[in-house]
Every structure is written in C-alpha cells, then in structure tokens.
Amino acid sequence: MTTSRRKFLLAAPALAVAASVPAFAHAQEKQLVHHVYFWLKNPSSKEDLNKLIEGISTLRPIPTVRQFRIGVPAATIKRDVIDDSYAVSLFTVIDDIKGHDVYQDHPIHLKFIEKYSYLWGKVTVYDSMDI
C-alpha cells in the first residue's frame, strides 16, 4: 500500500466527521414547530379531504420549511386526552420566527388560503419553540 493511500485511509474518518459538523450544528439550533389542524366543513366528504390534502401539499416548496408532514388521525386506542376529531394535520419545522413570518406571507401560502379555505370549517394552530 502506498504512503499517500495509507494517509488517506487514516484521514477519511476524520474528514467524514468534520464534513458532518455544520449539518449537525444547524440541527441543534432552536427551531419553531408550526402544527396546523384542519376540520372539514363537510367531514364525510372524501373528495373534500383529498382536495385539502392536495392543497396542503402545495405548501411544501416554501423555502423556510425544513420539515413537512401531512397526517390524518391515527387509529390509536381511544383515551380522554386524545382529540381525533380533525380531518388533516400539517406539521412543519421552520428555523425561527423570522422564517415563520416569511412562510405566513409567502405567495404560495396566501394562494393556498385563497384557493382551499372554502373546504375547512375550523383551523387550529399550535406554534412552539424548541427549548
């Protein structure tokens, strides 16, 4: 084995760790969780549910969104503390309040509200910051 190859093989693990530091450091910053719950005006309509999910999906490209998940109530055991009366939820992670403000005023978000708000009868939002 040549000396340069041996040096490379010895240095490779350290290089991999060093390359991952910025990504890890970014993930350790305190972020904002924006969790939105939607109740349909017509809860029995599968068509309305699918339209709302389609609409929520359009929010994914907003640049300040770091994580994006759409969900429906899970079929967990019924307990007094569980509210599964909503139709769809949107879970997003955003870097900070400034990024959240960009998200709220972004043309994609405003278009979503304009185009799909006729589908929901109630929306509840829970915003929280990492501690």
Range-by-range predicted roles:
Residues F91-I131:
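Surface-exposed, polar helix/loop patches in the mature regions of secreted/periplasmic/lumenal proteins
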Residues M1-A16:
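N-terminal secretory signal peptides and thylakoid transit peptides that target proteins
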Residues A23-E47:
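C-terminal segment of N-terminal export signals and the immediately downstream linker at the start
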Residues L32-L40, I77-Q104:
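Short, well-ordered beta-strand segments in beta-rich or mixed alpha/beta enzyme
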Residues A16-P22:
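Hydrophobic h-region of N-terminal signal peptides that target proteins for export
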Residues A23-H26, S57-A87, Y118, V125-D130:
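Short, glycine- and small/hydrophobic-rich beta-strand elements in well-ordered beta-sheets
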Residues S44-I70, P107-L119:
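Short amphipathic alpha-helical segments
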